Each structure stands twice: as C-alpha cells, then as structure tokens.
C-alpha cells in the first residue's frame, strides 16, 4: 500500500521586518492574501510585524483592502471573487462576530450585499497568538496582523501554530532572512516575495499541513519504490 500524500490548507505566515520596503511588501502581501478571495492554500493571510513598523503596515494593508483590491465576478481586473458557498460565507461571518475585544477590524469585516457569496477584503489587527483567528484557517479574504518585539518572538509566533505549509519574510537584511528561514518550521519560505511556485522546487508542508511533496524530483519520489541490487563481478 502506498502512503497517502496530501497538501492541506494552512494560514500562511508573512513576517515583516522594519527595514523592509513596506509599501512594496504590503502591496504584494495584499495580492497574495486576497487573490481568489483568500481561498488558496498558500495565501498570505497572517502577517506578523516588527513593533516599530506595525502601525505603518496596518495602515498600508488597510489602504490596499479598502481602495486598491477589486471585488466582483472573476475577470482579469478583479482579484477577489466570491467565497465558495453560503456555508463558507456564514463561517467567515462567525469569525468576525467572534473578534476579541482587544482586536481591531481596520478594513472590511462585512459581507457584500449583492447576489453571490462575496466578502469585503478585511484586515484584523492587534490579535494575540492564542486567538481563534490566528490558530485557525479562515480561508477567505481576511488578513490578520500581529506585533512582535524581536526576532526570537517572531519565530516563536510564526511556528506557534499546528500548520506549516509556507511562509515569507520581508527584509533588506538577507543574512537575517536566511537565519529566520532556517528557524521557520514551514515546508516553504519565500524571501521578499510570496506565492511564486516553480516546477523544479518541491511543494508541501510540515505538521498538520500535509505529508509528502509535489513538484520537482522529490514529487516523483512519492510515486516510486527503491530497490537495492548487488552483484559480485568476480563470480
């Protein structure tokens, strides 16, 4: 029997350092978080921000959600289409109804009153590590934002969920980025980008985000058996 292989959903983590190009980072994170209404296994829906850049990032992401990201029926100009069905729309509403008192909804937070299952691009700031929206997969156009004080806390927060599919880190300090990438417990780490996939690199998560890999030579290995053959050439 061949072992099962699965790539499962997970809230993807983006860590923003204060020396990053914040405007470019937030523009990219918004696209990576909201495209396909956030219904992608690698969507950038969870953002952890260094304290000194926190207010700027919340403002920039909120601006993207309110005034830049287009919502409607899918076409080349629209990034956010409907969520999958009525049950999923109600599930998203439930998450927003249960936003804790210490958190702020800085953009969106409501369904769109039109035919279909549309949800406004949403930003929820000031969340804590144990909050439901951090520990659960929302699978909708909802980006959550947390604050960290130092690199160790950023890594602790990033890894402190049961999922581990993919993550990204945004900084001009490549040495720091590589150090954090090594510490992240995720099957993929992007640096100063998010979402691009290439056929020659493996894709698959750790922990509850699945088993095995697809893409690349590692993906082929999932469908092969290894056989050892030895011969005595002197016989």
Feature-to-residue mapping (PLM):
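ALDH superfamily catalytic-core signature
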Residues: 1-128, 191
């Amino acid at each position: 029997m061949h072992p099962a292989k699965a790539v499962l959903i997970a809230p993807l983590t983006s860590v923003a350092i204060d020396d990053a190009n914040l405007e470019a980072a937030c523009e990219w994170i918004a696209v990576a978080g909201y495209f396909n209404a956030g219904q992608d296994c690698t969507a950038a829906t969870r953002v952890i921000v260094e304290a000194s850049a926190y207010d700027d990032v919340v403002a920039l992401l909120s601006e993207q959600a309110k005034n830049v990201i287009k919502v409607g029926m899918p076409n080349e100009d629209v990034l956010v289409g409907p969520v999958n069905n009525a049950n999923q729309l109600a599930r998203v509403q439930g998450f927003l109804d249960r936003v804790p008192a210490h958190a702020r909804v800085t953009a969106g937070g409501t369904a769109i009153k039109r035919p279909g299952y549309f949800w406004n691009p949403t930003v929820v700031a000031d969340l804590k590590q144990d909050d439901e929206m951090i520990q659960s997969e929302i699978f909708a156009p909802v980006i959550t934002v947390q604050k960290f004080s130092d690199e160790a806390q950023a890594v602790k927060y990033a890894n402190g969920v049961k999922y581990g599919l993919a993550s990204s880190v945004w900084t001009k300090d490549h040495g720091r980025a590589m150090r954090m990438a090594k510490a992240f417990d995720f099957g993929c780490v992007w640096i100063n980008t998010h979402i691009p996939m290439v056929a020659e690199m493996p894709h698959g998560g750790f922990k509850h985000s699945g088993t095995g890999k697809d893409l690349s030579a590692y993906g082929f290995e999932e469908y092969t058996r290894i056989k050892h053959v030895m011969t005595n050439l002197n016989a």
